[in-house]
Swiss-Prot record:
Disulfide bonds: none
MF terms (GO), sorted A to Z: large ribosomal subunit rRNA binding; structural constituent of ribosome
Function: Forms part of the ribosomal stalk which helps the ribosome interact with GTP-bound translation factors.
Name of the gene this protein is made from: rplK
GO CC terms, sorted: cytosolic large ribosomal subunit
Species for this entry: Oleidesulfovibrio alaskensis (strain ATCC BAA-1058 / DSM 17464 / G20)
Designated name of the protein: Large ribosomal subunit protein uL11
PTMs per UniProt: One or more lysine residues are methylated.
Keyword RNA-binding: yes
Length: 140
């Protein structure tokens, strides 16, 4: 018999830096999950991606066990890193904060492909280029 799923928890945590403080502790604690066990497992799985923000989907079960799936970093984080900017523009249509090449956009699209709804690479490239435009980053 399959375990009874009681919740799906979505978080974005710094790779290799999960700890019991908010937002991780309260999110897991309210479902009765072992916070330290999750933190150790997450940090072990993401230690090679230090410095990146990693989205994670945690599935909590009725017997207080859990499983989790890590996803690729958000496109906005990858674009900001490629353009060497701290954050996107507050006025993306007026003020440009940086630029990326089409090759960099293609690399990000290839990396993000499993998490995007695009059917093929050109569609994924358009999605990433749109994200760049909405952040005030020029695509050259």
């Amino acid at each position: 018999m399959a375990k009874k799923e009681i919740a799906k928890i979505k978080l974005q945590i710094q790779a290799g830096a999960a700890n019991p403080s908010p937002p991780v502790g309260p999110a897991l604690g309210q479902h009765g999950l072992n916070i330290m066990e999750f933190c150790k497992a997450f940090n072990a799985r993401t230690q090679d991606q230090k410095g990146m923000v990693i989205p994670v989907v945690i599935t909590a079960y009725a017997d207080r066990s859990f499983t989790f799936i890590t996803k690729t970093p958000p496109a906005s984080v990858l674009l900001a890193k490629a353009a060497k900017v701290a954050k996107g523009s507050g006025e993306p249509n007026k003020t440009k904060v940086g630029s990326v090449t089409m090759e960099q956009v293609e690399e990000i699209a290839k990396l993000k492909m499993p998490d995007l709804s695009a059917k093929d690479l050109p569609g994924a490239v358009k999605t990433i280029a749109g994200t760049a435009r909405s952040m005030g980053i020029d695509v050259k």
